[in-house]
Amino acid sequence: MSNPMRTPMVEKVIVHMGVGESGQHLVNAEEILKTITGQEVVRCFAKRTLPAFSIKKNEPIGCKVTLRGQRAQEFLGTSFEIIEKTLSRAQFDSLGNVSFGIEEHTDFPGMRYDPNIGVFGMDVTVVLKRPGERICKRRIATRKIPTDHRVTVDDAIAFLNESYGVEVM
């Protein structure tokens, strides 16, 4: 695009592992996520009690990391290589964000299978934005983002194809 204010960019990448239980299994997932991303991990807690899964309210059941800037770019490059640079159009939401899953953490470079730890999968969510989105986040003179300035699905697909060579089926 010729106008730099219309060019989409990556705001953040969220990597999430839903383990479903606390204890050593969750600690192993946190260590794997910290190794893969090189960043501190935050725990996710259950919102309500689910007796069928023996989950109590406020029990830690997952972990996540939010990546921004250069780390997000590097992680996305590796992640798209793992999923062979193919996405489905159904993986995009109406705001141009995209989510996809990685089935095994052992697909990442430098990660090997350890029978004591097991295999973990993860969810990756990419949030895209355009320059000028600060107007909806600032404290003074907050405004809505105009409809024509929001990132659409087609804009997101074009950006990912151009920047990372991702094909959308």
Curated annotation (Swiss-Prot):
InterPro entries in alphabetical order: Ribosomal_uL5, Ribosomal_uL5_arc, Ribosomal_uL5_C, Ribosomal_uL5_CS, Ribosomal_uL5_dom_sf, Ribosomal_uL5_N
Q: Name one GO biological process term.
A: translation
Q: Does the keyword Chaperone apply?
A: no
Q: Name one GO molecular function term.
A: rRNA binding
A cellular component term, taken from the record's GO annotations? ribonucleoprotein complex
Give any Pfam family that matches. Answer: Ribosomal_L5
Q: How does it assemble?
A: Part of the 50S ribosomal subunit; contacts the 5S rRNA and probably tRNA. Forms a bridge to the 30S subunit in the 70S ribosome.
Q: Which family does it belong to?
A: Belongs to the universal ribosomal protein uL5 family.
The job of this chain, per UniProt, is described as: This is one of the proteins that bind and probably mediate the attachment of the 5S RNA into the large ribosomal subunit, where it forms part of the central protuberance. In the 70S ribosome it contacts protein S13 of the 30S subunit (bridge B1b), connecting the 2 subunits; this bridge is implicated in subunit movement. May contact the P site tRNA; the 5S rRNA and some of its associated proteins might help stabilize positioning of ribosome-bound tRNAs.
Q: What is this protein called?
A: Large ribosomal subunit protein uL5
Lineage, highest ranks first = Archaea, Methanobacteriati, Methanobacteriota, Stenosarchaea group, Methanomicrobia
